[in-house]
Each structure stands twice: as C-alpha cells, then as structure tokens.
Amino acid sequence: MFKFINTLGKLVVKLYFIEAKKLDKKAKADSQRAIELAKQSREKSDAAVSGVHKSAAIAAKAQSMSKFFE
C-alpha cells in the first residue's frame, strides 16, 4: 500500500511539473505578443503625431494663402 501511495505521489508531482511547463510556455508566448503589440502601438502613435503635425502645417499654409486671395 505504501508503494502505491508513493507511486501515486510521484505521478502527481510529474503532472504538476507538466502543467507548470505549459503555463510557463504560454506566459512566454503572451509576453512576446505583448512586446510586439507595444512596438506596433508606438509606431502607430508616432505616425499619428506626424500626421497631426503635417495637417497643421498644411492648414497654416492654406490660411496664409486664403489671406493672399482676399
């Protein structure tokens, strides 16, 4: 009986290690995906800021040109 309990305990420990490996692998994949998404977010944010600056410059040119044609 003791041998059976000992074997069962070892099996449970192995199953815990397997589950821990699965969770660790998933966490690493999620972390990598989060890093990639953060990079994309930064690029999109920089592009948006650049677009705002360009539109402001064009609006200023349009306003100065409208004064010329009054």
UniProtKB/Swiss-Prot annotation:
This is Gene 4.3 protein.
